[in-house]
């Protein structure tokens, strides 16, 4: 079970490396890692388990965040009324198209690997199309918008060695395009 002390923190060089592409069939150790990453997300979103193990809530976890420089990220995005908008482990994900429309989270972004609060808007594309492989090696393409799109962009950034605060305007953190959508 992944716990907070297993999360790689900002400052560790693995978070700034471009992760290695995975080949199929996946090594069984990577299948176990994928299960553990998704388990962390589920546990972190369960108030009782999160409190018991002192887990910070997360909607995404990329392999570099647990010290593995491989192109794999798990996402578990809750929807309305206890539904799930997106539950998937993405292997070798690539954003193949993106909207011109910019969006950002109204409250800014956070990250399990970044312990400090970093205020500011993180401009992202409101709609994206992601091509990736499943844990079985099947190639899939999904179209995402709004919050799930932002979550996937954040996790894919981890695979490129980019952290969310790299996108924040250094001069004026609350500056964003006039027509940007703020997602609250």
Curated annotation (Swiss-Prot):
Family, similarity comment: Belongs to the polypeptide deformylase family.
Keyword list, A-Z: Hydrolase, Iron, Metal-binding, Protein biosynthesis
Enzyme Commission designation: 3.5.1.88
Cofactor: Fe(2+)
HAMAP family assigned: Pep_deformylase
Cofactor note: Binds 1 Fe(2+) ion.
Native source species: Pediococcus pentosaceus (strain ATCC 25745 / CCUG 21536 / LMG 10740 / 183-1w)
Biological processes per GO annotation: co-translational protein modification; translation
Active site: residue positions: 155
InterPro entries linked: Peptide_deformylase, Peptide_deformylase_sf
Substrates-to-products reaction catalysed: N-terminal N-formyl-L-methionyl-[peptide] + H2O = N-terminal L-methionyl-[peptide] + formate
Name the record gives this protein: Peptide deformylase
Function field: Removes the formyl group from the N-terminal Met of newly synthesized proteins. Requires at least a dipeptide for an efficient rate of reaction. N-terminal L-methionine is a prerequisite for activity but the enzyme has broad specificity at other positions.
NCBIfam families (UniProt xref): pept_deformyl
The organism's place on the tree of life at top rank: Bacteria
GO MF annotation, one: peptide deformylase activity
Taxonomic classification: Bacteria, Bacillati, Bacillota, Bacilli, Lactobacillales
Residues binding Fe cation, per UniProt: 111, 154, 158
């Amino acid at each position: 079970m992944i716990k907070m002390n297993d999360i790689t923190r900002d400052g560790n060089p693995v978070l700034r490396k471009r992760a290695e592409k995975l080949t199929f069939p996946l090594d069984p150790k990577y299948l176990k890692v994928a299960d553990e990453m998704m388990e962390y997300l589920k546990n972190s979103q369960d108030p009782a388990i999160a409190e018991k193990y002192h887990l910070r809530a997360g909607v995404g976890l990329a392999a570099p965040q647990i010290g593995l420089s491989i192109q794999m990220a798990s996402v578990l995005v809750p929807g309305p009324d206890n539904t799930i908008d997106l539950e998937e482990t993405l292997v070798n994900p690539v954003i193949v198209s993106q909207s011109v429309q910019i969006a950002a989270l109204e409250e800014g972004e956070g990250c399990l690997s970044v312990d400090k609060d970093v205020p500011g808007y993180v401009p992202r594309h409101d709609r994206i199309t992601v091509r990736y492989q499943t844990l079985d090696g099947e190639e899939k393409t999904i179209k995402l918008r709004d919050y799930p799109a932002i979550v996937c962009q954040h996790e894919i950034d981890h695979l490129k060695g980019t952290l969310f605060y790299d996108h924040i305007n250094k001069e004026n953190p609350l500056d964003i395009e006039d027509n940007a959508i703020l997602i609250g």
